[in-house]
Regions:
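Short, well-formed alpha-helical segments that are part of the catalytic scaffolds
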Residues: 15-29
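Acidic helix N-cap motif at the loop->helix transition within catalytic regions
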Residues: 19-21, 47-56, 97, 101
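Short aromatic/hydrophobic "clamp" motif used to bind/position activated sugar donors
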Residues: 89
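Short beta-strand/loop segment that forms part of the nucleotide-sugar
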Residues: 35-44, 65-69, 94
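Donor-binding/catalytic cores of nucleotide-activated saccharide
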Residues: 73, 94-195
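Cell-envelope/extracellular polymer assembly enzymes that use nucleotide-activated donors
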Residues: 5-8, 26, 37, 190
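Glycine-rich, basic loop-to-helix element that forms the pyrophosphate-binding segment
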Residues: 68-84
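A conserved acidic beta->alpha catalytic loop
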Residues: 26, 42-51
C-alpha cells in the first residue's frame, strides 16, 4: 500500500464477535479503502472476536489490522491511536455502523478541511449508532469555542462521545491527549481538551 492513509477508523473490540463484521463492513462501504485503514483493537475478549477479525483481514488485506491491547475501552483506543497512520481519526464502537450515504459528507468535509473536529448526527436505539446526515453538522472556529462549550453542556449525549466525530490526528497529539486508562468518562475528557 503506497497510498497516503487519509482516515484511520479505530474499533475497540471486546466480546464483539456478533457485531464486529457489520461495523467493519459499514466502514468499507463509506470509505475508499485505498485511503483508509481499519484498526480492530481486540482487548481481552473471551468469545471469538479474534477469529472474526482475522476473517476480515483475509477479506480486506492490509487495510484492516488486528491489534491487541489490555482490557479497557480507553486502553484499546489509545493503542489504536498509537498505530494509526491516517491524518484523520474516527472512533467506531464495535456495535455501531456508519450508513453508506455518509461517505459523501465525510470526504467532502475532510478534503475541504476548515476545522480539526467534525461532529455529525447519529441515532441511538434499536438501530445502531451511525453518522447520519449533513444537516445537523455545525462548524466551530476559535471565535465560537465558547458557544460549543455551552452546547456541549446542553446536549452531552451528542457532544461528549468520541463516536459520531472525525478528529484531525494532529490536534490530539498537539494537546498531548491520551484517553484516561481507567476512566469510563474518557469521552468527555477528549472533547474538553480539544476545545
Amino acid at each position: 500500500m503506497n497510498e497516503k492513509i487519509l482516515i484511520s477508523y479505530i474499533i475497540p473490540a471486546y466480546n464483539a464477535a456478533d457485531t464486529l463484521e457489520r461495523a467493519v463492513e459499514s466502514i468499507t462501504h463509506t470509505c475508499n479503502m485505498e485511503k483508509c485503514e481499519i484498526l480492530i483493537v481486540e482487548n481481552g475478549s473471551t468469545d471469538y472476536t479474534n477469529s472474526v477479525a482475522l476473517k476480515l483481514i483475509q477479506k480486506y488485506g492490509e487495510n484492516v489490522k488486528l491489534i491487541h491491547s489490555e482490557k479497557g475501552v480507553s486502553r484499546a483506543r489509545n493503542e489504536g491511536l498509537k498505530n494509526a497512520r491516517g491524518e484523520w481519526i474516527v472512533f467506531v464502537d464495535a456495535d455501531d455502523y456508519i450508513v453508506s450515504k455518509s461517505k459523501k459528507y465525510i470526504y467532502e468535509d475532510i478534503l475541504n478541511a476548515k476545522a480539526d473536529l467534525y461532529v455529525y448526527s447519529y441515532e441511538i436505539g434499536n438501530r445502531a449508532n451511525y453518522i447520519n446526515n449533513k444537516e445537523e453538522k455545525t462548524y466551530y472556529f476559535n471565535d465560537s469555542a465558547e458557544k460549543m462549550k455551552l452546547e456541549m453542556i446542553a446536549n452531552p449525549t451528542k457532544f461528549m462521545q468520541v463516536w459520531g466525530k472525525i478528529f484531525r490526528k494532529s490536534i490530539i497529539y498537539k494537546i498531548e491527549l491520551a484517553l484516561i486508562q481507567k476512566c469510563s468518562f474518557q469521552r468527555i475528557v477528549i472533547l474538553h481538551y480539544i476545545i
